[in-house]
Design a protein with these regions (language model features):
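Hydrophobic targeting/anchoring helices
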Residues: 1-51, 149-159, 166-177, 190-192
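Alpha-helical scaffolding within the catalytic cores
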Residues: 4-8, 69-75, 104-107
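A short, well-structured beta->alpha microelement
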Residues: 56-75
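Short acidic/histidine-rich motifs immediately flanking catalytic phosphotransfer sites
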Residues: 77-84
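The substrate-binding groove and active-site-proximal loops of carbohydrate-active enzymes
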Residues: 35-45, 86-102
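A glycine-rich, often tryptophan-bearing local segment used as a flexible ligand/cofactor-contacting loop or short
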Residues: 96-175
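Short catalytic/ligand-binding loop motif for oxyanion handling, primarily in non-cytosolic enzymes
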Residues: 29-32, 72-73, 93-94, 127-133
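A glycine-centered loop/beta-turn motif at secondary-structure junctions
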Residues: 15-20, 26, 32-34, 58-59, ...
């Protein structure tokens, strides 16, 4: 049946709504398998993230996998992308670790967002303790992680706000979630 279906589509590319780039340290090298290890055995550290990659496979998106070196070699690679996804725990190959110390990476992604590109972070995206921040894109995401360095800072931005994006949604379920994440003062909180 697969061969018949393949013959019928004649190599035609399906309609894609947007182009989505999964950003990690592997890029194309581990495309579609970036949250699986050792023949997809269950791993507590990454099983929560595998569903994100899996959901992309059935969505009407043109999905590409890029790494940080791709951005350094050709910052224009982001010009053709609508949304970047950075998924995983901090300081891992999933999210980038020390790559976030490179100002060209930060500048390229901030420019991408400033020019209307979307970015989705799940887990600890851009998470790497450096220059007084844990999330290197804290000002883009509007959140920071408490790692003990800012315990004495006031963190009073807890009020939730209504937003059209949640109007027809059921209760938001974040799954396991991450602890010690707080909103920055000017961030608009939709759900905690």
């Amino acid at each position: 049946e697969f061969r018949t279906l393949y013959a019928n589509v004649k190599g035609t590319t399906p309609y894609c709504v947007k182009k989505v780039a999964v950003l990690n340290c592997w890029g194309k090298m581990r495309a579609w398998g970036c949250h699986m290890v050792h023949h997809a055995l269950y791993q507590k550290q990454n099983y929560s993230y595998a569903g994100i990659i899996e959901s992309l496979s059935g969505a009407p998106f043109d999905v590409v996998f890029i790494n940080f070196q791709d951005i350094l070699d050709n910052p224009a690679i982001l010009d053709d992308i609508d949304v970047i996804i950075n998924v995983g725990d901090a300081d891992t190959a999933h999210t980038g670790g020390e790559w976030w110390e490179n100002p060209q990476i930060i500048e390229s992604i901030r420019r991408f967002v400033y020019n209307g590109g979307g970015i989705i972070g799940v887990g600890e995206p851009s998470g790497h303790q450096y220059q007084g921040h844990f999330f290197q894109l804290a000002n883009v995401f509007g959140v920071e992680e408490e790692t003990g360095f800012t315990l004495g800072y006031d963190k009073y931005n807890w009020d939730e706000h209504e937003h059209f994006i949640l109007e027809d949604s059921e209760e938001v379920d974040f799954g396991e979630g991450k602890k010690n994440i707080y909103a920055l003062p000017n961030a608009t909180i939709l759900v905690q």
